[in-house]
Amino acid sequence: MSHLAELVASAKAAINEASDVAALDNVRVEYLGKKGHLTLQMTTLRELPPEERPAAGAVINEAKEQVQQALNARKAELEGAALNARLAAETIDVSLPGRRIENGGLHPVTRTIDRIESFFGELGFTVATGPEIEDDYHNFDALNIPGHHPARADHDTFWFDATRLLRTQTSGVQIRTMENQQPPIRIIAPGRVYRNDYDQTHTPMFHQMEGLIVDKNISFTNLKGTLHDFLNNFFEEDLQVRFRPSYFPFTEPSAEVDVMGKNGKWLEVLGCGMVHPNVLRNVGIDPEVYSGFAFGMGMERLTMLRYGVTDLRAFFENDLRFLKQFK
């Protein structure tokens, strides 16, 4: 008890000298721990007469409280200093030049699809989709493609079994739309299609977009005008366009569409035709009342022509040196 004031003074001095929270905690243990100097003072109470013990205990507790308050104050001071130091170290120098954020870009084929969808959207076409794993009815039979047609051969088509396959065209979307919707119909059907072929101008998977209009009094003139306007818009120039007679099982008459290239040669860009009456009958539409036209085009081919790409496979190799050109 006689050294109590000295212990408090010694504790406060040690507290003030503590340079961090860890050192401060060592001081706390030294003076207020289970075997601390001030804690042990309580054991001296047994040496005092019973009537003096309460007053002496109060004095010891007061000394411990002074030390605890000093500990709390110093801890707050040290923590505040540490926080200020950390904030100072993390301060952002706004005068430093910023780091440039690298912007991404759309894949060139995606850019082509978006551009075509935008054009036909302004003409009132809606986008329709369908399954990539198709049955032979929607991929072939309903489209007036007979069983002996070469497209059904194993070397041209990826078959799962006798009736299921990876679709070879998005025409099945047209069939499903006509099965579930009465005319007037005006859709485009973009999507992935699959054919067993791989070379400089063919890949096993590629993107196709087909269009379909079914309504009363639709003529080949409507088809020609629509596609002529589309091609001029897509290539952003007034093109020389020709419609060359062709054959597709699902259209009659049918045509291939060519544009005159800068080298003075005709370039094939898409196929089209008037919807075959048998196709309309297959989906329950009366060909005596309604007519329509359809067209189909490869997205990769149009992208190659628009941007001057010579190898179709470049679209699938993910070479950033190639893709960065289209940002």
Swiss-Prot record:
Cofactor note: Binds 2 magnesium ions per tetramer.
CDD domains (UniProt xref): PheRS_alpha_core
Record GO cellular component, one term: cytoplasm
Top-rank lineage group of the source organism: Bacteria
Reactions this protein catalyses: tRNA(Phe) + L-phenylalanine + ATP = L-phenylalanyl-tRNA(Phe) + AMP + diphosphate + H(+)
Main location: cytoplasm
Any one Gene Ontology molecular-function term assigned to this protein's record: tRNA binding
Cofactor: Mg(2+)
UniProt entry keywords in alphabetical sequence: Aminoacyl-tRNA synthetase, ATP-binding, Cytoplasm, Ligase, Magnesium, Metal-binding, Nucleotide-binding, Protein biosynthesis
Keyword Aminoacyl-tRNA synthetase: yes
GO biological process, one term: phenylalanyl-tRNA aminoacylation
Listed EC numbers: 6.1.1.20
UniProt: Mg(2+) binding residues: 252
Subcellular location: Cytoplasm
EC category: ligase
Pfam families: Phe_tRNA-synt_N, tRNA-synt_2d
NCBIfam families attached to this UniProt entry: pheS
Similarity-based family: Belongs to the class-II aminoacyl-tRNA synthetase family. Phe-tRNA synthetase alpha subunit type 1 subfamily.
Subunit structure: Tetramer of two alpha and two beta subunits.
Descriptive protein name: Phenylalanine--tRNA ligase alpha subunit
Origin species: Klebsiella pneumoniae subsp. pneumoniae (strain ATCC 700721 / MGH 78578)
